Amino acid sequence: MYLWFQERDLNGFASHFLSESLGEMEHAQKFADYLIARGQSVKLDEIPAPVQTWDSIEDLISYSFNMEADLTSSLQQLYSISERISDTRTNVFLDPIIDAQTKSEDEFANILGKVKFASNQPSAILLIDSDLKKK
């Protein structure tokens, strides 16, 4: 996603997606560290290549928003399971991750709303790009 925007000289969008990807790597590391601290092994399976082509900025942002929403749902399911089995330690671990994930989902919803409102008008897209560059 970063590359898709970078190739189109939309540096604000590109920067936002680069930052998001680094955040996701940090979360993955936290999960691995947590599992290791609990005496578990971390098994990394092959990850299929991500989607790399979209018809429009709106399609890409919509795809990203749906990924964020799915991740939020998965984290909430994990939390529910740990709550049901009285695994307080896992709940405490998940609390800040779920908070950050919810904020990320909200941010993508906001960006998606702006992109939809812009209706592929180049000047409006450039304003959104500029706004993202400032963050």
Where are these regions (language model features)?
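Iron-associated oxidoreductase/ferritin-like identity signal
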Residues: 1-135
